[in-house]
Amino acid sequence: MGTDNQTWVSEFILLGLSSDWDTRVSLFVLFLVMYVVTVLGNCLIVLLIRLDSRLHTPMYFFLTNLSLVDVSYATSVVPQLLAHFLAEHKAIPFQSCAAQLFFSLALGGIEFVLLAVMAYDRYVAVCDALRYSAIMHGGLCARLAITSWVSGFISSPVQTAITFQLPMCRNKFIDHISCELLAVVRLACVDTSSNEVTIMVSSIVLLMTPFCLVLLSYIQIISTILKIQSREGRKKAFHTCASHLTVVALCYGVAIFTYIQPHSSPSVLQEKLFSVFYAILTPMLNPMIYSLRNKEVKGAWQKLLWKFSGLTSKLAT
């Protein structure tokens, strides 16, 4: 293959979801509202946990980390997507595309590991409740959170580097909403088997391994719940895990379907829809899931609103 055919591109063109102007404007309004709700919801969860001493527990410490990851992931994708909805020239510089891929891979990896850590926390809370405080002490929680963040940022630069060293042969049109891994790899004009193997290995390490740990944790949790004699006790134990289990199903389900088998990957349209779901819907839904299904969080919201209304009344008088 000639050198001329392997010319590096300086920018990419993201084809996005639609070329129709009216559709793009409608999507801009919809995604802008969803992004604002995502940022506000996750930031309010972090603020609520910070302000309410009753929520200063390992579970909510990890939830704080999850909210930070969610809002960061959405921010790595959505602002650029919104700008391109209204732009005629949907270009993204090479460096910006690489940075977007780096952060999306890193934050995705962090989330998968963090969800496994949260499953372990729920396992200890249900299966070893008497020793919960002794096991899940502050030092261990901090180390588990740091491990989650480090694991994502270790694998991401490797995956990003081997992806963007592929010759693109002047092919700069990315048929996606962002610089997503599989979409960028498809631009290469050389054999990408080694990249697909790397994607598979990375998926096993950062996706399937945490997922298996989650499954093992919940097998033990369910086994313990079934041994509880009282119906009220079983109900309380189940509600302890319900919110996390819902989030696990949302996050792992989409990622496994997209990445675990590159050779039989979904269609381009499905990939775009999965990316929208993962980058916008999931971060927006997570705070709602934890708020609506958790009595402690709902109680903290009521307490905060009561304080806020009291402060407003004082200022008004």
Swiss-Prot record:
InterPro entries membership: GPCR_Rhodpsn (IPR000276), GPCR_Rhodpsn_7TM (IPR017452), Olfact_rcpt (IPR000725)
Positions annotated with a glycan in the UniProt record: 5
Keywords recorded for this protein, A-Z: Cell membrane, Disulfide bond, G-protein coupled receptor, Glycoprotein, Membrane, Olfaction, Receptor, Sensory transduction, Transducer, Transmembrane, Transmembrane helix
Main subcellular location of this protein, as a coarse class: membrane
Localization in the cell: Cell membrane
Cellular component GO terms, alphabetical: plasma membrane
Membrane topology (Extracellular): 1-24, 80-100, 161-200, 262-272
Cytoplasmic-side positions: 49-57, 121-139, 223-236, 293-317
GO BP: detection of chemical stimulus involved in sensory perception of smell; signal transduction
Membrane topology summary: Multi-pass membrane protein
GO molecular-function terms, A-Z: G protein-coupled receptor activity; olfactory receptor activity
Cysteine pairs bridged by disulfides in the record: 97-189
TM regions (residue ranges): 25-48, 58-79, 101-120, 140-160, 201-222, 237-261, 273-292
Role: Odorant receptor.
Similarity comment text for this entry: Belongs to the G-protein coupled receptor 1 family.
Protein name listed in UniProt: Olfactory receptor 2F1
